[in-house]
Amino acid sequence: DVCSSDLAGDFAKTVLMPGDPLRAKYIAETYLENPRQVNAVRNMFGYTGTYKGKEISVMGGGMGMPSIGIYSYELFNFYDVDQVIRIGSAGAFQDNIKLMDVVIGMGACTDSNYAYQYGLPGTFAPIADYELLNRAVETAKRQGTNVVVGNVLSSDVFYNAMSNVNDLWR
């Protein structure tokens, strides 16, 4: 596995996962109290510390579904993690979404065949846990953050060969 088996128990039940491992390091050093590094395999840095008294981990997930798929699978299945929350940057199809807006995914769509590997027919579109979604939205609103809730799209392709693909997904 990509994480060291010596680290079982070192991850919190909740793991925040930006794509960039250096962003994970920045988050740990800036926001966590007493952060300790729990992973450096393949330079996919992971840290555990506390935030406002709650134990939390942050670890890079890499670029694309195959990368985060491997890391999240191992966190859930080998390290007893309960929640993985993807954080970080993304593109947008809607013109009303601005830089620094917080987008909270209510449902997740894909043009990938990733779900097929798990015996799921078609393109399974998981939806968010309502309680977690509602807490995130209410917290963002209380803090005066511009928040947009809706479906998100993940793709295996970063630079698509179809020039009109963005228009088709709108």
Language-model segments: which ranges?
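Short, small-residue-biased leader/transition segments that mark boundaries at the very start
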Residues: 2-4
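N-terminal low-complexity or amphipathic/hydrophobic leaders
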Residues: 6-40, 50-52
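Glycine-rich phosphate- or other oxyanion-binding loops that anchor nucleotides, phosphorylated ligands
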Residues: 40-170
